[in-house]
């Protein structure tokens, strides 16, 4: 194995701590007799455990070795794979090196573990190549990643040579992308102590669609039109969904992500205290072949908070314009995002700010930077009943209540639980359905 791995060129950036690199070192030590057998077995088991952990996280099955190698190909961001992501496979000298690397992966796919297993008295690789995973709920692993990895893994296993692997892998890069953006649709920002960050995939995204949101047809239409323009490469506006609590603003954003993910839409969730990282985040994604929504949920600022300045700088562009593949999407219960007080309107009570009204105007102008502002208001009584009936109709086992009983109970529920809203209706149906189980 170490001979094969040493021949990689474009895909040589595996990382010294990668499973493949570590196994390569172990096999080299075994071949040269440079390590005692019990130590080799222990080192192998450490990497097998890492592979099992990876398989559990991403839902690998059947042949974990093949799935792992496929995962490496999918995740490896190099000059070749990133170019294929942007423009697909094209004629060029680099294809010679790519096919040489794919020939290496073909040999790794067909690698014979029997000699080392027999010599060390182990069978772990045989088990990995004939693996039956414990059934798991979709929320426990990255289901969309699992489906893509296993499909490509099976196709590569059936490929006769590096030319077929080249076609399969480059088609994946073109259609799905490379790295974490190719395998996931939503991410959150994880800061580290050095002031930098990583993007971590979000596993349990709600599978909601806009059609699941009852009512709000004008709002959904406007959001869909703006998103359609965005993913089609046309001009689109930053979006502010504002209005009453529990009316489906955040749900609409998740739904639009699900509906357009197959066309390259991705979402990065950011919190207010992370706004100082916005320029770094945009620099990381601006050259990728995806459309990114930077999502801010429940956006608002108190009088003393100044983080809005980072957001304004990104929206307005400054020296560097906002990339065409980045859109700011925010939800808020406020139409004016920065809190305003009566004192703000009086230049005489400036507390050191000679032109306080100018300062106030600067703060309150943030909402105007969102060219697409969509208002969500609480439903009236009839609309609330329509939502209750609609959600109840989706229950697979239905409800034992008559319609009149259902609506009367819904009215009593909203009085005690925050008033009329779509969220209240959903919580009510959850409660009623729970009583029947």
Describe each model-derived feature in a short phrase:
Residues 1-214, 218:
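AAA+ P-loop ATPase mechanoenzymes
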Residues 205-239:
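Pre-Walker A (pre-P-loop) alpha-helix and adjacent loop at the N terminus of AAA/AAA+ ATPase modules
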Residues 234-253:
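Walker A/P-loop nucleotide-binding motif
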Residues 258-292, 300-304:
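AAA+/P-loop NTPase substrate/partner-engagement loops
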Residues 273-276, 299-302, 328, 332-338, ...:
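Conserved nucleotide-binding/hydrolysis micro-motifs of P-loop NTPases
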Residues 302-352:
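Conserved catalytic/switch belt of AAA+ P-loop NTPases
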Residues 349-364, 371-385:
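Conserved AAA+ ATPase "SRH/arginine-finger" region at the nucleotide-binding site
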Residues 373, 377-437:
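C-terminal alpha-helical "lid" subdomain
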């Amino acid at each position: 194995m170490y001979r094969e791995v040493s021949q990689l060129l474009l895909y040589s950036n595996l990382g010294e701590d990668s499973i493949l690199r570590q196994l390569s070192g172990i096999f080299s030590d075994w071949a040269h007799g440079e390590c005692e057998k019990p130590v080799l077995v222990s080192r192998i088991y450490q990497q097998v455990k890492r592979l099992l952990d990876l398989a559990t996280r991403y839902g690998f099955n059947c042949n974990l070795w093949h799935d792992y190698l496929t995962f490496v190909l999918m995740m490896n961001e190099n000059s070749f794979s990133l170019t294929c992501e942007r423009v697909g496979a094209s004629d060029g000298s680099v294809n010679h090196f790519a096919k040489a690397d794919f020939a290496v992966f073909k040999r790794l796919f067909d690698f014979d573990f029997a000699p080392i297993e027999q010599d060390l008295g182990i069978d772990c690789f045989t088990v990995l190549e004939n693996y039956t995973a414990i059934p798991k709920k979709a929320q426990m692993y990255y289901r969309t990643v699992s489906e893509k990895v296993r499909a490509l893994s099976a196709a590569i296993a059936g490929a006769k040579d590096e030319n077929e692997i080249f076609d399969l892998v480059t088609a994946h890069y073109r259609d799905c992308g490379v790295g974490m953006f190719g395998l996931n649709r939503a991410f959150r920002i994880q800061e580290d102590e050095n002031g930098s960050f990583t993007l971590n995939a979000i596993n349990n995204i709600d599978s909601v669609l806009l059609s699941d949101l009852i009512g709000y047809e004008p709002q959904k239409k406007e959001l869909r039109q703006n998103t359609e323009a965005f993913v089609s490469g046309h001009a689109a506006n930053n979006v502010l969904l504002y209005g009453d609590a529990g009316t489906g603003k955040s749900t609409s954003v998740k739904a639009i992500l699900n509906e357009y993910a197959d066309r390259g839409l991705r979402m990065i969730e950011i919190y207010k205290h992370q706004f100082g990282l916005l320029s770094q985040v945009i620099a990381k994604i601006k050259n990728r072949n995806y459309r990114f929504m930077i999502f801010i949920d429940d956006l608002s600022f108190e009088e003393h908070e100044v983080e809005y300045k980072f957001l304004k700088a990104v929206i307005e562009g400054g020296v560097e314009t906002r990339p065409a593949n980045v859109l700011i999407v925010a939800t808020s219960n406020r139409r004016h995002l920065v809190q305003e007080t009566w004192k703000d309107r009086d230049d005489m009570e400036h507390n050191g700010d000679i032109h306080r009204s100018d300062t106030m105007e600067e703060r309150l102008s943030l909402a105007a930077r969102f060219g697409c502002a969509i208002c969500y208001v609480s439903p009236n009584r009839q609309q609330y009943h329509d939502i209750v009936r609609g959600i109840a109709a989706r229950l697979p086992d239905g409800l034992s209540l008559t319609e009149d009983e259902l609506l009367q109970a819904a009215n009593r529920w909203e009085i005690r639980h925050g008033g009329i809203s779509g969220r209240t209706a959903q919580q009510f149906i959850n409660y009623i359905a729970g009583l029947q189980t």
